[in-house]
UniProtKB/Swiss-Prot annotation:
HAMAP family: UPF0145. It comes from the Bacteria. The gene is ybjQ. Disulfide bonds: none annotated. This is UPF0145 protein YbjQ.
Length: 107
């Protein structure tokens, strides 16, 4: 499965548009990680805990996106948009959503 934020794939022809596909992931943030991440942010360091959670959520969302595209018989998803949001009380959860158009291609 190929993923692209562009509307086309170089060197390939889109032969069929299969439909819009989406993938979402919502992960809760651990209160102790939040506390220590806040301290690192204050002293100017990077928050490895948050970066790891973002990466994990993005991987889950893309896996779901690919599963939906495969179910439609597609071999690629183009025009992908990635959004990040904090949700829940006091932004206690992280949501990653991805969407795009599932397509069949030919070289």
């Amino acid at each position: 499965m190929q993923f692209s934020t562009t509307p086309t794939l170089e060197g390939q022809t889109i032969v069929e548009y299969c439909g819009v596909v989406t993938g979402e992931a919502i992960l809760g943030a651990n209160i102790f990680r939040d506390f220590f991440a806040g301290i690192r942010d204050i002293v100017g360091g990077r928050s490895g805990a948050y970066e790891k959670e973002l990466r994990k959520a993005r991987e889950i969302a893309f896996e779901e996106l690919g599963d939906q595209a495969r179910a439609l018989g597609a071999d690629a998803v183009v025009g992908i948009d990635i959004d990040y949001e904090t949700v829940g009380q006091n932004g206690s959860m992280l949501m990653v959503s991805v969407s795009g158009t599932a397509v069949k291609t030919r070289r």
